[in-house]
Swiss-Prot record:
Its main location: membrane. NCBIfam families: lepA, small_GTP. GO terms for cellular component: plasma membrane. This is Elongation factor 4. The lineage of its organism: Bacteria, Bacillati, Cyanobacteriota, Cyanophyceae, Synechococcales. It comes from the Bacteria. Keywords: Cell inner membrane, Cell membrane, GTP-binding, Hydrolase, Membrane, Nucleotide-binding, Protein biosynthesis. It is a peripheral membrane protein. It comes from Prochlorococcus marinus (strain MIT 9215). Residues 7-189 form the tr-type G domain.
Length: 602
């Protein structure tokens, strides 16, 4: 398979916002080059998880090799490296872009450029990729190709005079795209003589062969009889097989510079073969690895608890298995008096969190309770020490700390002009600091805010979409920690702290949140035989309180007339019993109550 010359190889990826038709376009390219037979074709061929097909998003990267006979009657090999389009997975995107020389920029001709597309285009420009603008869905009645071309020129500064109009659904313009890839995307550099370096741009776990690594050979060549060394994890392996994805795996003996392939080497866990790591030969290693490798750091944390305590071992096993294929997932065991045993998990972002939760419930058949998402806070203690805390209930008491710092993000929101006011209102509610506002075109605007990450991870995205009828899009990146007037808000039920409901809030918002929490709990906790106080507190100060009145048995029902002292005696005895019960009784908080409160405006 390696007899192809480097000048005939084209490596490209597709950049697009969610829903702009990237997966459908990939399907058409596979079909038109004859890579996938008509009868094997299914919608979104490269999105292998059910979850991806259902949500219509790409989570795991896939790669496919196509052969294409161009108009100059030469045969070319086109390697499509698929990229996820969501902000949580931007590190994966940057790695796939590093493995390419060109990119198709797919924009929906009826919707225009969106935030996520822009973020990825800038990444592509940083990697010096040749960008080919493609306007998709031109068959839709609302499509306005000329207006969108102008938008691309104004926002991104790309020349769109030779942009391609296409409709992936009907197959219009697919041939033009293939020709443009051959003509405009530069071939890889011919570096076969240099020491071997290959970039890992994806890996997944196969229960039979261990981790399967997708890589692009940057320089030198890789033979299946050699031992490899992974430069970041410092581990070495003997190769079991190497091959190409066409799009099913086919074994080959050797791959050289410029080619894209997969390898299996009995690697135990995805964490050993991280995205962005460099593969080199054990006997003649390269001097330095490829630049840009980062370990994935979780930004959002939450507790995962099984609804049934017996499922705890199953949850542990499932998380271990999931971590084999998802190196960005971090977890550690945690216990809570209200929820029992569970895990504290770290994720790249909200979408990542939802996907992990859904995969656990779907693929491993678990019922889970998820506590409210939180971020990592930096707590400055009195002795000039700093600690980082991801679980609000473990933050030290006010007398032991000087201040709490929280992570801030710089957020860019792209939206039509008419939603300007409502978006600015939303950002102000979420303690955003206004930085700048730019008009991209006459009717589209960019708002730039600096906002605490904690305000973004709850339901900012949903709110933004609902306030703008789905037209706004956003992207953000971390800019560091800042001091704020933050407090730990505890909820006490019958004078006991309920850990899962502890949160860190801004002092100005604490009363409103505390008030609504106790009112909601009052509705949801069933009455007991004794009175239950529910309180919201900051340190030792109670800021809001409600109580659930006791159920009472009518102890006087058997007294007909008679002396009043008899009745008093019975009532006194009942009151004494209630007092003892209150001192000893435990309040069982139903899980529905926790769920409802966690959903309550998190």
């Amino acid at each position: 398979m390696t007899d192809i010359s480097v000048s005939k190889i084209r490596n490209f990826c597709i950049i697009a916002h969610i829903d702009h038709g990237k997966s459908t376009l990939a399907d058409r390219l596979l079909q038109d080059t004859g890579t996938v037979q008509q009868r094997d074709m299914q919608e979104q061929f490269l999105d292998s998880m059910d979850l991806e097909r259902e949500r219509g998003i790409t989570i795991k990267l896939q790669a496919a090799r196509m052969k294409y006979k161009a108009d100059d009657s030469q045969e070319y090999v086109l390697n499509l490296i698929d990229t996820p389009g969501h902000v949580d997975f931007s590190y994966e995107v940057s790695r796939s872009l590093q493995a390419c020389e060109g990119a198709l920029l797919v924009v929906d001709a009826s919707q225009g450029v969106e935030a996520q597309t822009l973020a990825n285009v800038y990444l592509a420009l940083e990697n010096n990729l040749e960008i080919i603008p493609v306007l998709n869905k031109v068959d839709l009645p609302g499509a306005d190709a000329e207006k969108i071309k102008q938008e691309i020129e104004e926002i991104i500064g790309l020349d769109t005079s030779n942009a391609i109009n296409c409709s992936a659904k009907t197959g219009v313009g697919i041939k033009d795209i293939l020709e443009a890839i051959v003509r405009r995307v530069p071939p890889p550099q011919d570096e076969i003589k240099l020491p071997t370096k290959a970039l890992i741009f994806d890996s997944y776990y196969d229960p039979y062969r261990g981790v399967i690594v997708y890589f692009r050979v940057i320089s030198g060549s890789l033979n299946k009889r050699e031992k490899i060394l992974l430069m970041a994890s410092k581990k070495n392996y003997e190769l079991d097989e190497i091959g190409i994805m066409a799009p099913d795996q086919q074994q080959v003996d050797e791959l050289h510079a410029g080619e894209v392939g997969y390898l299996a080497a009995s690697i135990k866990s995805v964490a050993d073969a991280r995205v962005g790591d460099t593969i080199t030969l054990l006997n003649s290693p390269a001097n330095e690895p490829l630049p840009g490798y980062k370990t994935a750091n979780p930004m959002v944390f939450c507790g995962l608890f099984p609804t049934d305590a017996d499922q705890f071992p199953d949850l542990r096993v499932s998380l271990e298995k999931l971590q084999l294929s998802d190196a960005a997932l971090k977890y550690e065991p945690e216990t809570s008096s209200a929820m029992g045993f569970g895990f504290r998990c770290g994720f790249l972002g909200l979408l990542h969190m939802e996907i992990v939760q859904e995969r656990l419930e779907r693929e491993y058949d678990l019922d889970l309770i998820v506590t409210a998402p939180s971020v990592i806070y930096k707590v400055n203690l009195n002795q000039q020490e700093n600690i980082f805390i991801d679980n609000p209930s473990t933050i030290p008491d006010p007398q032991l700390r000087e201040s709490i710092e929280e992570p801030y993000v710089k957020m860019e929101i792209y939206a039509p002009n008419e939603f300007n006011g409502t978006l600015m209102g939303l950002c102000q509610e979420r303690r955003g600091v206004f930085i700048d506002m730019k008009y991209i075109t006459t009717d589209r605007v960019t708002l730039i805010y600096e906002i605490p990450l904690a305000e973004v991870v709850t339901d900012f995205f949903d709110q933004m979409k609902s306030r703008t009828q789905g037209y706004a899009s956003m992207e953000y990146h971390l800019i560091g920690y800042r001091k704020n007037d933050l407090v730990r808000l505890d909820v006490l039920i019958n004078s006991e702290r309920a850990d899962p409901l502890t949160s860190i809030v801004h002092k100005d918002k604490a009363y409103g949140i505390g008030r609504s929490l106790v009112e909601k709990l009052k509705e949801l906790i069933p009455k007991q035989q004794f009175k239950i106080p529910i309180q919201a507190s900051i340190g030792s100060r109670i800021i809001a309180s409600e109580s659930i009145s006791a159920l009472r048995k009518d102890v006087l029902s058997k007294c007909y007339g008679g002396d009043i002292s008899r009745k008093k005696k019975l009532l006194k005895k009942q009151a004494k019993g209630k007092k003892r019960m209150k001192a000893m009784g435990k309040v069982e908080v139903p899980q529905e109550a926790f769920m409802a409160v966690l959903k309550l405006n998190q």
